A protein has these predicted regions:
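Short active-site neighborhood of thiol/selenol oxidoreductases, capturing the structured segment around
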Residues: 40-53
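Bacterial N-terminal signal peptides that target proteins for export
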Residues: 1-10
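N-terminal leader/targeting and pre-domain segments
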Residues: 21-39, 131-132
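Hydrophobic h-region of N-terminal signal peptides that target proteins for export
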Residues: 12-20
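Thiol-based oxidoreductase modules, predominantly thioredoxin-like and allied folds used
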Residues: 23-27, 48-49, 68-87
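Typically the conserved alpha-helix immediately C-terminal to a functionally engaged Cys/Sec
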Residues: 55-71
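Non-catalytic, surface beta->alpha helical segment in thiol-disulfide oxidoreductase systems
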Residues: 98-132
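Solvent-exposed loop/turn segments at secondary-structure junctions
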Residues: 50-53, 62, 83-87, 97-98, ...
Length: 132
């Protein structure tokens, strides 16, 4: 079997992958909080539950290849935390029973800037409105 078709396929896919617009999620709350403080940015906290199809769907549909992704990356420090990893983030501050939940936080005061978005309310339209 020739490697030539695979080579051309990879060359064709590379620009698509490089042009994909996605949120630069961090996976550690403490690191994200320190970065947000240092850069004077807001903290965007997405709490997900492992093996939750709605969480995966929302990440794919609302946080990939959207016009507002650059705005999120420039104005905020986004972090994903898992409910099951409760020791890795202040669960008492981000307590929720609905997954996923999206919190908008003033990093210096550790206060919520608005009501969180829960589950299916995390839509492209809602996120776009918040960034205007």
């Amino acid at each position: 079997m020739s490697k030539q078709p695979l080579k051309y396929l990879l060359l064709w896919l590379l620009p698509l992958l490089l042009s994909a617009n996605f949120v630069n999620w961090l996976g550690n709350y403490d690191v994200a909080h320190q970065k947000a403080l240092k850069e004077h940015k807001l903290l965007l906290v997405l709490v997900v539950k492992k093996n939750n199809s709605l969480s995966s769907q929302i990440i794919k549909n609302s946080f990939m290849d959207q016009d507002y992704v650059d705005g999120i990356n420039s104005k905020m420090v986004p972090v994903i935390v898992t409910y099951e990893g409760a020791l890795s983030y202040p669960i008492e501050m981000y307590y929720t029973t609905i997954f996923p939940t999206l919190f908008f936080v003033d990093s210096s005061k550790e206060t919520f800037l608005r009501e969180p978005l829960y589950g299916e309310r995390i839509t492209k339209e809602e996120i776009q409105k918040l960034l205007q």
